[in-house]
Amino acid sequence: MESIHCNSLLNPNFSLNQRRRRINHAVLNRRDALLRSLNAVELRRSRTFSAVRTSNFSVTAAATDVGGRNSTDASVMTTAMSGVERGVRVGKSSSALEQLDIERGVCVPFRKYSPETVRSKVLESRGAVVSLVSRGVEIVWTLGLYWSTLTYDFLVGRDEEVVPFRARQLRNLLCNLGPSFIKAGQVLANRPDIIREDYMNELCILQDDVPPFPNEVAFNIIEEELGQPLENIFSKISSQTIAAASLGQVYRATLRATGEDVAIKVQRPQIEPIIYRDLFLFRTLASFLNGFSLQKLGCNAELIVDEFGEKLLEELDYTLEARNIEDFLENFKDDPTVKIPGVYKNLCGPRVLVMEWIDGIRCTDPQAIKDAGIDLNGFLTVGVSAALRQLLEFGLFHGDPHPGNIFAMQDGRIAYVDFGNVAVLSQQNKQILIDAVVHAVNEDYGEMANDFTRLGFLAKDTDVSPIVPALEAIWQNSAGKGLADFNFRSVTGQFNKLVYDFPIRIPERFSLVIRSLLTQEGICFTLKPDFKFLEVAYPYVAKRLLTDPNPALRERLIQVLFKDGVFQWKRLENLLSLAKENVAKMSSNPNLRVKRVESKLDLTDTIKDGARLFLLDEGIRRKLILALTEDSKLHVEELVDVYRLVEDEVDIPTLAMQVVQDLPNVFRDFVLSWSNSVLSDR
């Protein structure tokens, strides 16, 4: 029976509608599966497949159906499908999975993966022993030969000079071993805690493009999943795939009922038994190597396989990606700068996904973007802001934003496709990330090291004192270059070196985040080589700190403004200037003239909360009074400078009226605070 963690209902990352979807997911999946099975049986009885398709169904060539799309006009959808941390829990979780849940810090309402589930599925299948032995021999023989060549290179002293060749050899080897190993290679490309950097660089270009499987097979799968003939649903469908990958392939089609163009993802046939078999072998090998990996590499091999297995199995259920799309639609429903394609839930199943077709311009073609009349700087600003909102505001992050998945719309919006591979961050992890930013600003590297422990990069009992100087060196070296030379790739490269010197393990969710940020930064540099990522990122973060009513962010704002108990007037001025810059860039973006974008920095709630804190929090009140009178003088000049920054952003009469209206509540809270203080003194 499918199980639900009740705590998932309280997850603050998700809206009420999103929580409802998670509650009903298991029941609806069971119902839909039964309906699909019944419809498929009926379909097999009555279908005259080839005759109907020949007479009534229009299969068009991809070149004409796509409308002569060139290399710059885009909507190619890859099929890297990784759901968020969900699945059906079957059986008792292993200790590694329990550790995975603890480290993740998010609720897991559904789970398909557990070592016990994989073992039972594999061993209960027909011919399991023969299949496992033959596959095991193939894997051991292939990897053994490769390992022997590495050993020989080391013995003859040429191991360093042949690294480029061996790295390419490893990439080709993984491709030949099939989809599980292709996905494993993509994971390794983001794990400096497991392999060295030169091999990572080679695996970064690992593509899961593979020959497509026959159309007849794909169309049969679509009909089985949807429970009716194709010609009843689509008036035409491309005769060639738009994209083909290790787990599935994509077609373009037109809905018969509405005439809308859609993209159809179809999963490869009989891929699930292959994935389960390989995961069983991976987990078996990991159990043998776990002691070695813990001692020599400082990482838990079983935990790494469990993270990988959970994500990979979720890729096999396209209903999870449909739910991801709904979540992104919910998150960006009021954002006029972002386009998320709609999903046709009634036309989706575990092996088929139907979503809105996106017509856009490939995001790595600056000339095509300019020719379309799209302001390049405006598009980059929109893209960076959208990425930061996903990471710091929603906690639901697109994990694979490569050029085939991001497009520029004619109206200046940024469009995303392919939502299978997403990273989910809990509310706690989002707050820790903001803490890390605050600690970096305050140059508190000891607390920054503790943040890495809280995020799961370091074991809880790790002594962080040796790591603090290394973090300080990295940050000061990067920050000292200024915005002109600061970029994530250089910082990540320096951080990767720490992995080899300290027991640092990169959690899977953060490897996705890091890869995503690096990919998007690379897209920005492709469009504009002198683009300064932080010149857009800093204003967004400043605006978020100043305007977000979240109590946790209010606390972080106070930490930023006070250093060693001293109020930082310059930081407040910088934050205000940066936040105003963010609003100005968005409101003046020529791509968004017809969109509703805020034109002023709304500080009303911030000022009201500040007044409330001043009255109710004795510590804050004392600090602010000291800030105004420190060094035996009134800081009138600083106050005037701050006022000049906000005078155009704040409607003083309206704010005064709101403060007056709020006075009864503030006075009540003040009396309660005062009475509690008096009673506690007694």
Swiss-Prot record:
Source taxon at top rank: Eukaryota
EC code: 2.7.-.-, 2.7.11.1
Any single GO BP term: response to blue light
Disruption phenotype: High chlorophyll fluorescence and reduced non-photochemical quenching (NPQ) caused by defects in photosynthetic electron transport. Specifically deficient in the electron carrier plastoquinone, as well as in beta-carotene and the xanthophyll lutein, and defective in membrane antioxidant tocopherol metabolism. Altered plastoglobule protein composition.
Subcellular location: Plastid, Chloroplast, Plastoglobule; Plastid, Chloroplast
Keywords assigned by UniProt, alphabetized: ATP-binding, Chloroplast, Kinase, Nucleotide-binding, Plastid, Stress response, Transferase, Transit peptide
Induction (free text): Up-regulated by methyl viologen (paraquat, MV) treatment, a herbicide triggering photooxidative stress.
Residues that coordinate or bind ATP: 242-250, 265
PROSITE patterns, per the entry: PROTEIN_KINASE_DOM (PS50011)
Residue stretches making up the Protein kinase domain: 236-567
Active site positions, chain numbering: 400 (proton acceptor)
CC terms in the record's Gene Ontology section: chloroplast; plasma membrane; plastoglobule
Catalyzed reaction equations: L-seryl-[protein] + ATP = O-phospho-L-seryl-[protein] + ADP + H(+); L-threonyl-[protein] + ATP = O-phospho-L-threonyl-[protein] + ADP + H(+)
Enzyme superclass (EC): transferase
Annotated transit peptide: 1-79
Tissue distribution: Expressed in all tissues (e.g. especially in leaves) at all developmental stages from seed germination to flowering, except in the root tips.
Any one GO molecular function term: ATP binding
Role, per record: Kinase that can phosphorylate the tocopherol cyclase VTE1, a key enzyme of tocopherol (vitamin E) metabolism and involved in the recycling of oxidated alpha-tocopherol quinone, possibly stabilizing it at plastoglobules. Also regulates plastoglobule protein composition. Prevents photodamage of chloroplasts under continuous red light, thus working in opposition to ABC1K3. Together with ABC1K1, contributes to plastoglobule (PG) function in prenyl-lipid metabolism, stress response, and thylakoid remodeling.
Family: Belongs to the protein kinase superfamily. ADCK protein kinase family.
The protein's assembly and partners: Interacts with ABC1K3 in plastoglobules (PG).
Official protein name in the record: Protein ACTIVITY OF BC1 COMPLEX KINASE 1, chloroplastic
Species annotation: Arabidopsis thaliana (Mouse-ear cress)
Gene giving rise to this polypeptide: ABC1K1
